[in-house]
Design a protein with these regions (language model features):
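P-loop NTPase Walker
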Residues: 1-79, 283-286, 554
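A short helix->loop->beta-strand "cap" motif at the edges of active sites that frequently abuts
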Residues: 56, 234-238, 556-558
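Accessory N-terminal region flanking or inserted into the helicase ATPase core
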Residues: 1-5, 12, 28, 100-214, ...
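C-terminal accessory regions
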Residues: 451-487, 493-499, 504-599
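Conserved two-lobed SF2 helicase motor
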Residues: 61-63, 193-197, 482-490
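Conserved helicase motor core of SF1/SF2 NTP-dependent helicases
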Residues: 8, 34-37, 212, 219-306, ...
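Helicase P-loop NTPase motor core of nucleic-acid translocases
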Residues: 1-30, 41-45, 171, 196-199, ...
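Conserved helicase/translocase motor-coupling segment
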Residues: 322-485
Length: 602
């Protein structure tokens, strides 16, 4: 089943709601989602339809790695973590940068040698390649630091069979040796990575105890995951796979769209309509994705005629902030999504945007306007109106208020009172319980008013504190926290908004992968003598990167805004290259006017 973007989730839910769920029962079905966030969303929707709790469905709606974790009966201590990777790299003598250090830097973590070695090891496992094939990974390797394969390394020695491959003074890193050392280190310490889990499940033929298998986002599975799927498939009564080959965003992890395109199925259903995209936006994204060499052609009908596509050349972050603010104020019911290629770019925008006081959600796992923070803010607003707060909001106050708010008392005293009230109320969800403002002020006599709410916060990040301060000082109090969402393009998968802003800036890591792929394919890039990670502007895209931007652009229900050269210092992907795969030097307005027309029939 090869559905296209948009509301495929509802179509899949309808398919799931037929014989499997309403016949044998939901416990006989395993729904495999690619990410934890996607699994959580499916659980919520299914729970609502089945009148079941989402938590109860965790064993039946999860990622393949989560199911492998259960089948292998692992604990968290068995799984490789950031500190384990750091420790190995220190022992082996190579640099490593953890995800927290690298999240806000312009250069990517994967350009650090230890990160590249471990990522290469994982990529080889996911694509079922031997260690000797390490040079196939889409990375660029510096011959000054790394021994390349002897047939391409200028320092390799040739002669008779007794001639050593490398000179005795060659102290460059041997990548296969480092990969084998990493795998041996994991074994010595009794640790497994995500790829190791899937290998063990496949090798031991461990099967989920279900009769029906549903695999979502099938286009993003790796060869290793496909092997697990092949191990499970013969034991199922019925299998449903759903995916869109144009939406492969995890190719850098080994995802292979050909696994979807070449899969032999009994029934192949191509959904005919786009439930999200109006005609102009649909035509533009079709223009962008049409340059992919191998793909399944789709002839989609738009949700409606019209829609708006805008291109903004060389805006500043402040320009983008003003654009988003104007959007929020002009379309009072509309939703907005601002997407970047990397988290560090998103943080640059957040730094400028926080001062507006507009509440927002982060699609990534960053601690910003979380549910926890929103509940604290709602509690402060409610107390300011001298109205009762919910039991959940009261607990947030007890937990997040600074010690000074409790005067000579203790926060535990408020917790004790709330515990007693919950027992008396006998409610399953404390959000349904009310607590009068007098009780809160009795135990927290210095509970702040909105103006001081940020100053009296604890257990929050600097960004969160600044957000609360700006919110109560601004004009957007009471605004729905979900109206504005920020994230990376990857984190936006499966979501949508009325207004979508997509920054076309890339990262050195991405450009490095593009350059490596172009070199492997032997492609000529007009106007570029040497294509490296420092090439700017970027003159071409790979199919994999084109699919990523297709996902970002196809989130828009009403308006798509493309932002060219937004992020200072980031490699610039011009919009003409995005739409035509090469520089055209055409005027942006002319480019968009042409792209908004339907593609000629193939």
């Amino acid at each position: 089943m090869n559905p296209r973007p948009v509301s495929r989730a509802n179509d899949r839910l309808d398919c799931r709601g037929r014989p499997p769920v309403r016949g044998p029962g939901e416990r006989d079905v395993l729904v495999v989602s690619y990410t934890r966030a996607a699994a959580a969303e499916v659980r919520e929707r299914l729970a609502e339809r089945l009148d079941e709790s989402a938590r109860a469905l965790r064993g039946n709606v999860c990622t393949m790695h989560a199911k492998a974790y259960d089948l292998l009966n692992l604990s968290r201590d068995d799984v490789v973590g950031e500190t384990d990777k750091q420790e190995f790299c220190e022992d082996f003598g190579i640099d490593y940068e953890d995800e927290y250090e690298g999240s806000r830097r312009r250069s990517a973590r994967s350009t650090t040698m230890g990160n590249k070695v471990i990522a290469t090891s994982q990529w080889l496992q996911r694509t079922r390649r031997d260690v000797s094939e390490w040079y196939d990974v889409p990375f660029k390797w510096d011959v000054e630091d790394v021994r390349l394969p002897p047939d391409v390394d200028p320092n390799a020695q040739t002669g008779n069979k007794y001639t050593p491959t490398w000179p005795s003074d060659d102290d460059r890193l041997d990548i296969p040796e480092a990969i084998r050392a990493w795998r041996a280190w994991k074994g010595k310490h009794g640790l497994v990575g995500f790829a190791d889990m899937l290998e063990r499940v496949e090798q031991r033929s461990l099967l989920p105890n279900v009769d029906y298998l549903v695999i979502d986002e099938f286009q993003d599975i790796t060869t290793l995951q496909y092997d697990v799927y092949e191990e499970w498939r013969p034991h199922m009564e019925r299998v449903l796979i759903a995916g869109d080959d144009d939406q492969v965003v995890y190719a850098w992890q080994g995802a292979d769209p050909d696994l979807l395109l070449d899969e032999d199925v009994d029934e192949d259903v191509v959904l005919p309509n786009s439930y999200r995209l109006p005609s102009r936006i649909l035509n533009v994204v079709n223009q962008e994705v049409s340059h992919i060499e191998k793909r399944q052609e789709k002839d989609l009908e738009p949700r409606k005629e019209g829609g708006t596509v805008e291109a903004v050349p060389r805006p500043s972050m402040l320009d983008l902030v003003r654009n988003v603010r104007s959007t929020v104020e002009t379309d009072e019911e509309g939703t907005a999504m601002i997407l970047f290629r990397a988290r560090y770019q998103m943080f640059q925008f957040i730094d400028e945007f926080i001062g507006e006081g507009i509440p927002f959600r982060c699609l990534t796992d960053q601690r910003m306007w979380t549910d926890r923070l929103s509940q604290y803010v709602a509690a402060i607003e409610t107390l300011a109106e001298d109205e009762p707060v919910t039991g959940l909001q009261a607990r947030r106050l007890a937990d997040m208020l600074a010690d000074s708010a409790f005067g000579t008392g203790e926060r535990d005293e408020l917790f004790d009172v709330l515990d007693s009230r919950e027992e008396e109320a006998d409610v399953e969800d404390i959000a349904g319980m009310t607590v009068e403002p007098e009780l809160i002020r009795e135990h927290a006599p210095f509970v702040p008013d909105p103006r001081s709410a940020a100053d009296m916060l604890r257990k929050v990040t600097n960004f969160q504190e600044r957000s609360v301060d700006a919110y109560f000082a601004g004009d957007y109090q009471g605004m729905d926290r979900d109206r504005v969402r920020l994230g990376t393009i990857h984190s936006a998968k499966g979501r949508e908004a009325d207004h979508v802003f997509v920054a076309t800036d890339l990262t050195e890591k991405v450009v490095e992968q593009i350059a490596a792929t172009v070199e492997q394919e032997g492609r000529e890039v007009p106007g570029v003598d040497t294509f490296t990670k420092h090439t700017d502007p970027v003159p071409t895209l790979t199919d994999n990167e084109r699919r990523v931007f297709y996902v970002g652009m196809s989130r828009a229900r009403e308006r798509l805004v493309l932002l060219e050269d937004l992020v200072d210092g980031a490699p610039n992907l011009p919009i003409d290259v995005l739409l035509h795969n090469e520089p055209t030097d055409a005027d942006l307005e002319e480019l968009l006017a042409e792209a908004e027309q339907p593609l000629p029939a193939q």
